[in-house]
Amino acid sequence: MKLNKRSVAHYALSDSPADHTGFLRSWGGPGSPPTPSGTGRRYWFVLKGNLLFSFETRESRVPLSLVVLEGCTVELAEAPVPEEFAFAIRFDAPGVRPHLLAADGQAAQEAWVKALSRASFGYMRLVVRELESQLQDARQSLALHRCASQRAVASCSKSQAPDHRAPDPENGHFLPRDRSSIGTVEERGIRPIGRDLTEWELQGPASLLLSMGQSPVSPESSCFSTLHDWYGKEIMELRRGWQQRAKGSQTENKSQNRP
């Protein structure tokens, strides 16, 4: 892997936030000579993304080393010195020595192992796949919940539908229980008993039914096409009566104009 040293050094010293920082003891690593056994060397480490920088001190302006955390694993290890909280960065490439590091305490050791294990792009890809799977499951669950809610609302609406029984006489008029008589009067054009022929012709079946306290609107005829056909028959009756009266007036005029 080829890197621009100046760009890498600028990134290491830039104001971009670091993912983890702290002092660690080092016993050598990839590309560096092995450190003699003993207490190791104490350096300041800075983790930014998948790049681990080491500095001589916290105030140093030049990084000593760089470890690219790809194709590697981070695991606990034994340090050359007892009572050291050590861990190792092991690479999959053959012949590459592990990078042995040690923290000042167990809490620092666990924090470093967690941060370094999550620094690679491979880990980020796994996280993205898991989040995508959770998002898909959440969307499916939400869709099922909405479908169940709509069914529950529809069922509740049907169970709470108003009762279309005949109202009390105090509230107005009665709705007929048997609509067959209405249809017979309407279809055959039979004049109801007690109604004058002129009134029947002028008002038509629908108007007379309304004046008699009978309404064509019912739960079974709530659609527009049914209501349109119902009141259209009234218009046809009115038009037929008008045509008959017009023919009668024309006949009278002709008879009067004869010598």
UniProtKB/Swiss-Prot annotation:
GO CC, any one term: Golgi apparatus
Annotated InterPro entries: Boi1/Boi2-like (IPR045188), PH-like_dom_sf (IPR011993), PH_domain (IPR001849)
SMART domains: PH
Domain PH stretches: 17-121
SUPFAM superfamilies reported in the protein's UniProt record: PH domain-like (SSF50729)
UniProt entry tagged with the keyword Phosphoprotein: no
Superkingdom to which the source organism belongs: Eukaryota
Localisation: Early endosome; Recycling endosome; Golgi apparatus, trans-Golgi network; Cytoplasmic vesicle, Clathrin-coated vesicle
Keyword line: Coiled coil, Cytoplasmic vesicle, Endosome, Golgi apparatus
UniProt motif F&H: location: 223-235
Main location: other
A Pfam family recorded for this sequence: PH
Reported function: Plays a role in endocytic trafficking. Required for receptor recycling from endosomes, both to the trans-Golgi network and the plasma membrane.
Oligomeric form and interacting partners: Forms homodimers and heterodimers with PHETA1. Interacts with OCRL and INPP5B.
Description of its domains: The F&H motif, an approximately 12-13 amino-acid sequence centered around Phe and His residues, is essential for binding to OCRL and INPP5B.
Name used for this protein in its record: Sesquipedalian-2
Gene: Pheta2
